[in-house]
Amino acid sequence: MYDMTKLKTRYFDIRLKNGKILNLEPPKLKVLRKIASLSEVKTSGELTENDIKNLTEAVSLSLSKNKQNYKITSENVEENYDIDEMVDFMENYFDWVNSIQNSKN
């Protein structure tokens, strides 16, 4: 019998700007779809207020799914991280999600 409770959870370790270390858990598919949708940033033209709001929410959702149960609000992200940091984080986060999706347990 296949036992889903035996799957080993993989974590994405990250150090926040405040020095706190988090072990991010893989997102559930529903949350992953939402994060992917929210994090789509225009590659040409200017960012709109809505683009920035969506990216900030995507980063907040991604960072808040962690082993430590440490919640990070969109306001916290907006106050402490710039656009380059948010985009860089999302690129690395999706690279990690793709790597665990493509590897065996």
Residue spans of the language-model regions?
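Glycine-centered tight beta-turn/hairpin loop motif at sheet-sheet or coil-to-beta transitions
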Residues: 17-19
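Short acidic, Pro/Gly- and aromatic-enriched capping/linker segments at domain boundaries
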Residues: 1-13
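Short, surface-exposed, charged amphipathic helix/loop patches that serve as local interaction elements
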Residues: 9, 23-105
